[in-house]
Amino acid sequence: METPPLPPACTKQGHQKPLDSKDDNTEKHCPVTVNPWHMKKAFKVMNELRSQNLLCDVTIVAEDMEISAHRVVLAACSPYFHAMFTGEMSESRAKRVRIKEVDGWTLRMLIDYVYTAEIQVTEENVQVLLPAAGLLQLQDVKKTCCEFLESQLHPVNCLGIRAFADMHACTDLLNKANTYAEQHFADVVLSEEFLNLGIEQVCSLISSDKLTISSEEKVFEAVIAWVNHDKDVRQEFMARLMEHVRLPLLPREYLVQRVEEEALVKNSSACKDYLIEAMKYHLLPTEQRILMKSVRTRLRTPMNLPKLMVVVGGQAPKAIRSVECYDFKEERWHQVAELPSRRCRAGMVYMAGLVFAVGGFNGSLRVRTVDSYDPVKDQWTSVANMRDRRSTLGAAVLNGLLYAVGGFDGSTGLSSVEAYNIKSNEWFHVAPMNTRRSSVGVGVVGGLLYAVGGYDGASRQCLSTVECYNATTNEWTYIAEMSTRRSGAGVGVLNNLLYAVGGHDGPLVRKSVEVYDPTTNAWRQVADMNMCRRNAGVCAVNGLLYVVGGDDGSCNLASVEYYNPTTDKWTVVSSCMSTGRSYAGVTVIDKPL
């Protein structure tokens, strides 16, 4: 029996029409076949024709570079060329078209992109590639350049990228660079780019409510540094700049000891008026301060950047290279690039977007080497060595300089102190402390550097004494002693208060904690930690004080706990480090974007 013919696939059963039917309803039921490789294959062939100079109908000239191409391809991909070749301009008929605004190599890259959809953006070419892509209206290339620049944002270049984005109408990149500068203000102001800004740009930056700063003193010191960079020209702008510094939010001691003594303030009657306003604010009862409304009494409201706690090296039980980070948001630890060499008992700071591991012990020698870690590149680099070998030292940042305080050189405890200038990559000595201090803890409050406790090898005693350094006078001064001797205490700063955590006095390892208030020059006890710790790392983040690792007198600890000053309680973090470590360097950084 013969099989009956099947009805056409595109028609309804019982209502067949001839193939040349004009009924549009038939087409609605026909599947459309799309070949995803067709366009790619076509452009590949067109590019091969171009490379052989076949069917080319125009030569694009830039400088001494001549590039053969097809008008229809250029017009299809670039609105710039579309307008050129379809309009009434003479170029629409010309065999050779010269483009003066773009260099030859850049133009070749962009025409290659038109045919291949491939382009490589690098640090070397992005500044010429982006404006050229803008000229040719190749928006995808321009977007790729902007994304590349966004990935390169760093405290040393974000202001330059912001200016570049503004010049070339890259609105999204401009906003992201501006936000980055606000979020990394404390490091940005240490850069050459900041010092070279114009007055309008400085005012715009420091007036932002979104600045992420630990204290308003960062803004004041930035203003002084900017003016002093070209003092003869810029000192006339002091009053205008100080209008945006929120002096009432600074501690009274800082106003008296630093702001009032600054020559640039003394020489300006308007600046003195702002200082008087700030002092009046401090004299008012708390309930009346809210009535004194001005832009300078308004708290800044920064966007909180995600934070990471970085734990570098340490003793586990020997000196190690391992570096791990704790993500506060994800509540987990992860490993990052190891130190170039083993290091424990080092000083640790975060400055200018970099983590610095200063001095320490490599398992056999006390060292004076310094390594810096770039979180964006996940890479360690060596910088200038200190002048002296130091382990169990304290390290802190004051007025843009990294200070290495005291320590042990292998034979004796040290009272000497040296400072590192990141711009010149040089170390220099400053005034020594009054007492030799190894296993010393340090912190900065109100523009002063504090050295807390430690061990004096001369007297062979753990210390309860504390002294502070004034960089303006280059002098160390004793302040109130702690209630107990502490060597190897963790020291941290939270809410303009100085905390001394744990430590030991001889064989006795402590869990007690005391806090110093510079306004009263007095120490007071707060809640004990959950466990005894000495040689632990301390850092403050999000209103909490974290204590990391250390040892309890018998073993190294992998645990972490934090102190909440509101509740006066310590809480153990559920996630521990991968290994117990004491004498590790600890600091908090902004999570790389």
Swiss-Prot record:
GO-annotated biological processes: proteasome-mediated ubiquitin-dependent protein catabolic process; protein ubiquitination
Primary location recorded for the protein, binned into one broad class: cytoplasm
Alphabetized UniProt keyword annotations: Actin-binding, Cell projection, Cytoplasm, Cytoskeleton, Kelch repeat, Repeat, Ubl conjugation pathway
Bias (Basic and acidic residues) ranges: 17-28
Pfam families membership: BACK, BTB, Kelch_1
InterPro entries according to UniProt: BACK (IPR011705), BTB-kelch_protein (IPR017096), BTB/POZ_dom (IPR000210), Kelch-typ_b-propeller (IPR015915), Kelch_1 (IPR006652), KLHL2_BTB/POZ (IPR044072), SKP1/BTB/POZ_sf (IPR011333)
Gene Ontology CC terms: actin cytoskeleton; Cul3-RING ubiquitin ligase complex; cytoplasm; cytosol; lamellipodium; ruffle
Protein origin, superkingdom: Eukaryota
Keyword Chloroplast: no
Residue spans of the Kelch repeats: 308-353, 354-400, 402-447, 449-496, 497-543, 545-591
Tissue distribution of the protein: Ubiquitous. Detected throughout the brain.
Pathway membership, UniProt: Protein modification; protein ubiquitination
Record domain BTB: where: 56-123
Intracellular or extracellular location(s): Cytoplasm, Cytoskeleton; Cell projection, Ruffle; Cell projection; Cell projection, Lamellipodium
GO molecular function, one term: actin binding
Region listing for Disordered, in residue ranges: 1-28
Quaternary state and interactors: Component of the BCR(KLHL2) E3 ubiquitin ligase complex, at least composed of CUL3 and KLHL2 and RBX1. Binds actin. Interacts with KLHL12. Interacts (via N-terminus) with FYN (via SH3 domain).
Function summary: Substrate-specific adapter of a BCR (BTB-CUL3-RBX1) E3 ubiquitin ligase complex that mediates the ubiquitination of target proteins, such as NPTXR, WNK1, WNK3 and WNK4, leading most often to their proteasomal degradation. The BCR(KLHL2) complex catalyzes ubiquitination and degradation of NPTXR. Responsible for degradative ubiquitination of the WNK kinases WNK1, WNK3 and WNK4. Plays a role in the reorganization of the actin cytoskeleton. Promotes growth of cell projections in oligodendrocyte precursors.
Name under which the protein is recorded: Kelch-like protein 2
Organism: Homo sapiens
